[in-house]
Amino acid sequence: HSFHKLYPGIVIEVLQGTYDDVVYWIKNGVVDMGFLSASSAGDLSIVPLYKDPLLCVMPQNMERHGDGEYIGIDEMKTYPFVAQRESTDADIQNFLKGSALDVHAKYHVVDDLAMVSMVAHGFGICIMPEMVMKDIPYEVKCYPIKPEAYRIVGLATQNSEFMAPAVSTMYQYIIEHYKQKDEVDV
């Protein structure tokens, strides 16, 4: 909204898709830039913007086997899981593999809202990025994960040096206004 006020002559079209969709769109010139997880960017140029913690999401009324404000891998292993399809969120899949958290989910979904709705209705727990959970309309509990798990969200382009002037203007605006104040490294 603030960009449009400063540059009313620049028309912006927003597309939503999976990480794979966004990579494909950038590489094939469908879009000029896109927001991606750094782990999904492949050979695209990416500027890290935000370190987004992963959270364990539980039904509001589920009794925990552990206690405290955090949840560990060993405790997560004791609950049923609602999982995203592998192509949906690479960071969560990488976390599961890296933590030896062998998830035998009975439910596999693509949509974030559908997954959190299933958790809210008692089908199990899930792992979601904090940014996704900020405006979720379901009553669930969210716990930070120990050891810390996160994704790095960045602004990806085919080549940040060769952009149309309007694209370059928006690219620089996003970096200047939305990059997390703390250093975010890939």
Model regions: which residues?
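Hydrophobic residues within well-ordered alpha-helices
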Residues: I26-K27, M76, S117-F123, L155
